Design a protein with these regions (language model features):
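Rossmann-like NAD(P) dinucleotide-binding subdomain of oxidoreductase/dehydrogenase enzymes
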Residues: 1-83
Length: 83
């Protein structure tokens, strides 16, 4: 999972998402509350590029609820957090 900050959201998300996808991992990403549109656009580009559904996933929600789900879900093996 990735949790990105409000400053430089696209650049910081790309640094986390691209390597994970390149080695065959799925990704769940949560943008900052202030800048969700930048990652929505990025994930639309991934879908347009042919990334299959369920491989790159975007979650928009309350910080605490999403963070708790990341930390508690057994399928999440790594978390990259900036901020």
């Amino acid at each position: 999972g990735t949790i990105t900050p409000w400053n430089f959201p696209s650049a910081l998300a790309s640094r986390k998402i691209a390597p994970a996808l390149a080695v065959g991992c799925t990704v769940v990403s949560r943008p900052a509350d202030q800048t969700p549109l930048s990652l929505i656009g990025q994930f639309e580009c991934l879908a347009d590029a042919g990334v299959p559904p369920g491989v790159a996933n975007l979650v928009i929600g309350k910080s605490r609820a999403v963070a708790d789900a990341f930390f508690e879900h057994p399928a999440v093996r790594k978390i990259s957090f900036t901020g």
